[in-house]
Design a protein with these regions (language model features):
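Beta-rich, blade/repeat-based domains predominating
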Residues: 5-15, 56-68, 98-110, 116-121, ...
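Residue-level signature of beta-propeller blades and closely related beta-rich strand-turn architectures
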Residues: 25-26, 78, 119-120, 189, ...
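A short loop-to-beta-strand structural motif that recurs across blades of beta-propeller domains
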Residues: 36-40, 81-83, 142-145, 192-194, ...
Length: 316
């Protein structure tokens, strides 16, 4: 159904509990992030329903998330492309928000959009093409950008980033606190979980600062808030649940499933979370209280053909 020689869109209208995975079909021998953009659709029982081959993309489709209107968003940050898919399963026309490497988004109840700029500086990832800013030898500024529901730019938040080993990552993951007063975010494989006050437009104290050097794998990766304000935080082969002060409430060890949990999202039932492991290519459905793995999906794309870069659930 979903091979590079048979690119037929079979995505179905969204149903409550459907799971969506960003999993580009990699097919370039030189560029290890390049291929045919693809979003896989599964039902709530984790049975495959369909596939959407994304238009206008050339590299990894990452950062899947839903807005309050049930539209699915995704990103090809390599080419400054923002993807939107309507609840009927049809991709909406691509809107060019900005010449920026947006890789994630979060939303407020007023319909405003807050994009995380996934790239920073001018040190490119050596294995893949990354588009520069127009007229500049620069990948990005690593900021957060606010747009209104008419897609008009409103404000740029010049946020802090956390140094990381590769020197090109900016705001790679972001999540809106339930109060809608601030955004919590990370620089993937950096040492910090950071917060920015979007009401007062100011950097807040870091929520988490990890010890060690940039090569020791003691790193911050993905974050996502639970509705009650607890924070999910992935650490490679496990994830933590943090309180509002950044203290660890609980730890779920998933080491038997490998290192590389690059995305995490809470399930709508309040009892489970979904994790995306970019190295193994496997999505896990995990009980939040016990850590029991109750379901999984193997995308078939693992190291070196790693492309599993997003997981989202349609809540109806």
């Amino acid at each position: 159904m979903d091979t590079k020689n048979d690119k037929i869109n079979t995505m179905q209208p969204f149903a409550k509990g459907d799971i969506f995975l960003g999993c580009t079909y990699l097919n370039d021998e030189i560029d290890d992030h390049k291929g045919d953009g693809r979003i896989l659709q599964y039902d709530k029982e984790l049975n495959q329903k369909g596939v959407l081959w994304t238009q206008g993309t050339e590299h990894l489709v990452i950062g899947l998330t839903f807005d309050p209107n049930g539209i699915l968003w995704g990103f090809d940050m390599h080419n400054h492309v923002v993807i939107r898919v309507a609840p009927d399963g049809i991709q909406l026309p691509n809107h060019h928000f900005a010449d920026r490497a947006f890789s994630n988004a979060t939303f407020d109840s007023q319909g405003n959009i807050y994009f995380g700029e996934g790239l920073v500086g001018n040190t490119p990832y050596p294995g893949s093409y990354l588009k520069r800013l127009p007229g500049l030898d620069l990948l990005g500024y690593g900021n957060i950008y606010k747009f209104n529901q008419e897609f008009e730019p409103v404000e740029v938040f010049e946020v802090a980033n956390s140094p990381e080993f590769h020197h090109f990552k900016g705001v790679t993951h972001s999540t809106m606190h339930p109060s809608e007063g601030f955004i919590t975010y990370t620089t993937e494989i950096g040492k910090k979980v950071m917060c920015y006050d979007i009401v007062s437009n100011k950097q807040m104290d870091d929520l988490v600062v990890l010890p060690g050097d940039l090569t020791d794998k003691v790193v911050a990766i993905a974050v996502n808030y639970l509705p009650d304000g607890r924070l999910l935080h992935t650490r490679g082969d496990y994830f933590e649940v943090l309180d509002y002060q950044g203290n660890v409430i609980s730890t779920i060890n998933l080491s038997e499933h490998g290192w590389g949990i690059a995305q995490i999202t809470p399930a709508s039932d309040g009892e489970h979370v979904f994790t995306a492991n970019i190295f193994s290519g496997v999505m896990l459905k995990v009980k939040l209280d016990s850590g029991e793995v109750v379901g999984s999906i193997d995308t078939g794309f693992k190291v070196p053909k790693r492309s599993f870069g997003g997981v989202a659930e349609f809540t109806g």
